[in-house]
Design a protein with these regions (language model features):
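Glycine-rich, flexible N-terminal cofactor/catalytic loop recognition
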Residues: 1-72
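A contiguous loop/helix-start segment that scaffolds small-molecule binding in enzyme catalytic cores
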Residues: 2-7, 11, 67, 91-92, ...
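Generic beta-sheet signal
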Residues: 13-17, 89-97, 145, 168-172, ...
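Short active-site oxyanion
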Residues: 35-41, 119-123, 169-170
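Conserved helicase motor
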Residues: 69-78, 150-152
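Short phosphate-binding loop-to-helix
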Residues: 73-87, 107
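A glycine-rich beta-strand to alpha-helix segment
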Residues: 86-133, 176-181
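Class I SAM-dependent methyltransferase SAM-binding "motif I" and its flanking Rossmann-like core
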Residues: 109-166
Length: 291
């Protein structure tokens, strides 16, 4: 039993800490204390971490100093193995990103999963997140939501069509040079009047939240949008009880009679009824039987 206790004491601990997403005053005291006490810090961008520490008047690692290493998408696998080795030797490893919580659209979850598998303790110092911040200021339902990260550059249309029937509020990240095209694609896939909010520069001096239908927002964004951007989109409306499987098939057929291609007709019916596109597709093509 003594050997087991000694072994447990030699195991390190992984600490995932959230940094402010724009406002230095959002840095919690626990974060500043952890940065001063840390011996090993894995940062998405070491230069930006040192800039943050300087602004916050924090000496990384205190008098003894900390070993600060980079930990980002390109080196996540290799660096993760190195950090795991540190943890096995009993080191406490502090992981931070440029802004927000590690593991949320940033490296962290794979290392946390590896630690959990090996029985290495994992804890967090909660901090700001652009995901939940955008959600709560959007004015859209917050009881059920999903985070989609950055939409893919390739296959955007099919990706969004698959999400057309998602009933939960959706949160996305997007870059300034792609936001207008993405909103336009969302308007096509989800419907021009689907409510959304574009949240820009959250917690910063020029914070802005623009609300409206997707088509309206796409037109606004076409004039140019700058800064860090989060997009919140309301979920699909629940399927009306009167919309039976037979009604869905008939609706697609009616659109085809009007000259609409079947693929587009399926997308439209799914969008209008809130039924997942895959379900409408399977019904129309006889993959599943109508109920």
């Amino acid at each position: 039993m003594v050997e087991g206790a000694d072994e447990r004491r030699r195991v390190g601990r992984l600490v995932l800490a959230g940094l402010p997403i724009g406002n230095l005053e959002d840095a919690p005291p626990r974060l500043l204390h952890a940065l001063r006490e840390a011996r090993v810090i894995a940062a998405e961008d070491t230069r930006r971490l040192r800039q943050f520490a300087s602004r916050a008047d924090v000496r990384l690692g205190g008098e003894s100093g900390a070993r600060v290493v980079s930990y980002y998408d390109a080196n996540e696998s290799r660096r993760g193995d190195e950090l795991l080795a540190d943890l096995r030797r009993g080191e406490e490893v502090l992981v931070v990103t440029d802004a927000g919580m590690p593991g949320v659209s940033d490296p962290g979850y794979r290392l946390a999963a590896a630690c959990a598998e090996e029985g290495i303790p994992v804890t967090a110092i909660p901090g700001p997140s652009a995901v939940t911040t955008a959600l709560v200021v959007s004015g859209l339902p917050t009881d059920r939501f999903c985070f989609e990260g950055f939409p893919p550059r390739k296959g955007l249309r099919s990706y969004l069509e698959e999400l057309a029937g998602e009933r939960r509020t959706m949160v996305f990240f997007e870059s300034p040079h792609r936001i207008a095209a993405t909103l336009e694609a969302m308007a096509t896939a989800f419907g021009t009047d689907r409510r959304a909010a574009v949240c820009r520069e959250l917690t910063k001096t020029f914070e802005e939240v623009r609300r409206g239908g997707l088509a309206e927002l796409a037109e606004w964004a076409s004039e140019g949008v700058r800064g860090e951007i989060s997009v919140v989109v309301e979920g699909a409306r629940p399927r009306a009880e009167s919309t039976s499987d037979t009604d869905l098939i008939a609706a697609v057929g009616a659109l085809e009679d009007e000259g609409v291609r079947r693929k587009e007709a399926i997308v439209r019916v799914a969008k209008e009824t809130g039924v997942p596109k895959r379900r409408v597709y399977d019904l129309v093509h006889g993959v599943v039987e109508a109920e």
